[in-house]
């Protein structure tokens, strides 16, 4: 029966479908595609690295590009296996930086060839050459053997392709469908479209990228650079906050001068208050601890507006003033030092040393705890490591010379000693806690690192050796009247505790200096006059919100601008 039915179906008469192709296609000729270089370039897609506030690789100078590469490789080596994504974002960032470095080399070589040949039109390299150069440059970035650093997207190719279109309008014959699709720019409007795979050019399938809802804007509203020139994108815009960000990112105006297609430029940004969410433990008056598994909204964090940098400011200022200090802790800050307070920049020693003195002389000038603290500057730890590792025959004389760093101060009479550490393009903090006479638990060393990047055991060992050397030196003289238990002082080399604490972690790779400064400030606010081992519980992962530390960038900027203005009035 089934066979008979199948035969009957085969006997059904098949008719031909008639299509009027002339009516369907029309008589109009398809115009030849022209690619025209314009002044305004569409905004780029989000960076492959996933860091929205990342520094634009195009805006970096050559030496800054090398510094960023060095830092990213160091981060990948130390933290790659510890991160949730196994360092994928860092490898992508390394790939972008390596490609930008190769692009500059290629552009410079092309210009030199044009100068030799007297040509005015740049020769367009083959697409395969471009991608093979980029993939070769990415192979040596991480040394991890993964494919993350070898990735080159079509967005990157578009950026290179558009750089060479600086001549007038001219017809271009596209080679194939892939380039035709790229030339029309249709790939830009398809935010969820997978990147095309080209195996022979070492492409790989990239994850789907959602279109960036907001762009970044410099928080310097109508600010000027140190020379008085007005910065681009000066006025604040209005935009909607990114829900996943603790900041309110302000959208840019149409006057975007970025000249790169293909991925998001970290434009100038503005920080405003935005509601945050986090899980927390709240302690009620009856000492009952309630753990909240679900996230709860927190009150908005108030962030200052960055003030304008006026013209005609002095080149340098000195802090603190002569009436606040005897001159031994004087810090010099120049206008060019303010650049490190730009978004995405790493804080430098002059700014960090300034804010440490500012906290000491202004914020906590009347605080008893701060008054009994000693603050070393950012250059001290390097000298400390040299002193404790010195192997010469004049070791004692070398240490006596090293003691000039705290001449006139008896360190063991202090409550706390703060030592900033700068190694491997990263900042962390050591706090030495001196107990009182009733506490026989010994001295305590705390290391606070917002990335966990610095070798804690090595730092503990260096600081211990430093304290033992100072103890040996002081024990040569008559007994001292110190606020330390006699039992602890007699056996001090063996009475030094290492406190392993967990602290809030930064959400990027450039706020480590801000976290160092916020560690100092928050510690002085909450620490007792003399710390015990039981007091260490105040330091934990939820000690403060990372956004609070990041917000110091604008605070310090405003403080310094105000001091420069006052310095100008004094002059």
Curated annotation (Swiss-Prot):
<keyword id="KW-0378">Hydrolase</keyword>
<keyword id="KW-0645">Protease</keyword>
<keyword id="KW-0833">Ubl conjugation pathway</keyword>
<feature type="active site">
    <location>
        <position position="426"/>
    </location>
</feature>
<keyword id="KW-0788">Thiol protease</keyword>
<dbReference type="GO" id="GO:0016926">
    <property type="term" value="P:protein desumoylation"/>
</dbReference>
<feature type="active site">
    <location>
        <position position="512"/>
    </location>
</feature>
<dbReference type="GO" id="GO:0005654">
    <property type="term" value="C:nucleoplasm"/>
</dbReference>
<dbReference type="GO" id="GO:0070139">
    <property type="term" value="F:SUMO-specific endopeptidase activity"/>
</dbReference>
<dbReference type="Pfam" id="PF02902">
    <property type="entry name" value="Peptidase_C48"/>
</dbReference>
<keyword id="KW-0539">Nucleus</keyword>
<dbReference type="GO" id="GO:0009651">
    <property type="term" value="P:response to salt stress"/>
</dbReference>
<dbReference type="GO" id="GO:0010228">
    <property type="term" value="P:vegetative to reproductive phase transition of meristem"/>
</dbReference>
<dbReference type="GO" id="GO:0005634">
    <property type="term" value="C:nucleus"/>
</dbReference>
<feature type="compositionally biased region" description="Basic and acidic residues">
    <location>
        <begin position="222"/>
        <end position="233"/>
    </location>
</feature>
<dbReference type="InterPro" id="IPR038765">
    <property type="entry name" value="Papain-like_cys_pep_sf"/>
</dbReference>
<feature type="active site">
    <location>
        <position position="449"/>
    </location>
</feature>
<comment type="similarity">
    <text>Belongs to the peptidase C48 family.</text>
</comment>
<dbReference type="GO" id="GO:0006508">
    <property type="term" value="P:proteolysis"/>
</dbReference>
<dbReference type="GO" id="GO:0016929">
    <property type="term" value="F:deSUMOylase activity"/>
</dbReference>
<protein>
    <recommendedName>
        <fullName>Ubiquitin-like-specific protease 1C</fullName>
        <ecNumber>3.4.22.-</ecNumber>
    </recommendedName>
</protein>
<feature type="region of interest" description="Disordered">
    <location>
        <begin position="221"/>
        <end position="260"/>
    </location>
</feature>
<comment type="function">
    <text>Protease that catalyzes two essential functions in the SUMO pathway: processing of full-length SUMOs to their mature forms and deconjugation of SUMO from targeted proteins. Cleaves precursors of SUM1 and SUM2, but not of SUM3 or SUM5. Able to release SUM1 and SUM2 from conjugates, but unable to cleave SUM3. Protease activity mainly directed at deconjugating SUM1 and SUM2 from their target proteins. Regulates salt stress responses and flowering time. Redundant with ULP1D.</text>
</comment>
<dbReference type="InterPro" id="IPR003653">
    <property type="entry name" value="Peptidase_C48_C"/>
</dbReference>
């Amino acid at each position: 029966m089934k066979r008979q039915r199948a035969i009957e179906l085969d006997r059904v008469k098949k008719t031909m479908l008639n299509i009027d192709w002339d009516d369907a296609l029309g008589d109009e000729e398809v115009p030849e595609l022209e690619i025209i270089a314009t002044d305004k370039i569409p905004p780029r897609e989000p960076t492959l690295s996933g860091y929205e506030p990342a520094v634009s690789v195009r805006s970096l100078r050559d030496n800054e590009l090398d510094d960023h590469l060095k830092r990213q490789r160091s981060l990948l080596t130390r933290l790659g296996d510890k991160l949730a994504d196994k360092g994928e974002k860092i490898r992508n960032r390394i790939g972008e930086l390596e490609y930008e470095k190769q692009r500059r080399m290629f552009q410079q070589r092309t210009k030199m060839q044009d100068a030799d040949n007297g040509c005015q039109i740049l020769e367009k390299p083959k697409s395969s050459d471009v991608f093979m150069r980029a993939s070769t440059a990415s192979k040596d970035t991480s040394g991890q053997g993964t494919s993350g650093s070898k990735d080159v997207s079509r967005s990157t190719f578009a950026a290179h392709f558009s750089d060479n279109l600086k001549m007038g309008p001219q017809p271009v014959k596209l080679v194939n469908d892939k380039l035709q699709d790229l030339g029309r720019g249709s790939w830009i409007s398809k935010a969820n479209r997978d990147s095309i795979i080209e195996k022979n050019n070492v492409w790989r399938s990239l994850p789907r990228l959602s279109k960036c809802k907001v762009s970044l804007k410099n928080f310097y509203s109508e600010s000027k650079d140190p020379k008085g020139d007005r910065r681009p994108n000066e006025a604040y815009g209005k935009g909607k906050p990114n829900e996943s960000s603790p900041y309110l990112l302000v959208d840019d105006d149409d006057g975007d001068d970025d000249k790169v297609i293909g991925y998001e430029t970290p434009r100038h940004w503005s920080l405003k208050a935005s509601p945050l969410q986090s899980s927390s433990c709240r302690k009620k008056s009856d000492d009952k601890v309630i753990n909240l598994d679900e996230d709860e909204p927190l009150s908005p964090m108030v962030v200052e507006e960055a003030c304008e940098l006026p013209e005609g400011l002095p080149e340098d200022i000195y802090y603190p003033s002569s009436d606040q200090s005897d001159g031994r802790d004087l810090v010099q800050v120049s206008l060019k030092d303010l650049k490190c307070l730009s978004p995405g920049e790493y804080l430098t020693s002059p700014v960090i040393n300034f804010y440490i003195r500012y906290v000491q002389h202004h914020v906590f000038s009347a605080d008893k705890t701060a008054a009994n603290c000693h603050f070393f500057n950012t250059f001290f730890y390097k000298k400390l490591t040299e002193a404790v590792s010195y192997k010469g025959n004049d070791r004692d004389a070398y240490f006596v010379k090293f003691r000039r760093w705290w001449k006139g101060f008896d360190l063991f009479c202090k409550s706390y000693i703060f030592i900033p550490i700068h190694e491997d393009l990263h900042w962390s903090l050591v706090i030495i806690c001196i107990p009182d006479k009733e506490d026989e638990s010994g001295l305590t060393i705390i290391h606070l690192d917002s990335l966990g990047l610095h070798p804690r055991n090595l730092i503990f060992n260096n600081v211990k050796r430093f304290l033992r050397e100072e103890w040996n030196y002081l024990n040569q003289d008559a007994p001292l009247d110190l606020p330390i238990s006699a039992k602890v002082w007699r056996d001090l080399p063996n009475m030094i505790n290492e406190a392993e604490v967990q602290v809030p972690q930064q959400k990027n790779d450039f706020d480590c200096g801000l976290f160092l400064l916020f560690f100092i400030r928050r510690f002085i606010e909450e620490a007792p006059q003399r710390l015990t081992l039981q007091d260490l519980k105040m330091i934990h992962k939820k000690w403060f919100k990372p956004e609070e530390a990041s917000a110091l960038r604008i605070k310090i900027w405003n403080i310094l601008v105000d001091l420069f203005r006052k310095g100008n009035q004094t002059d």
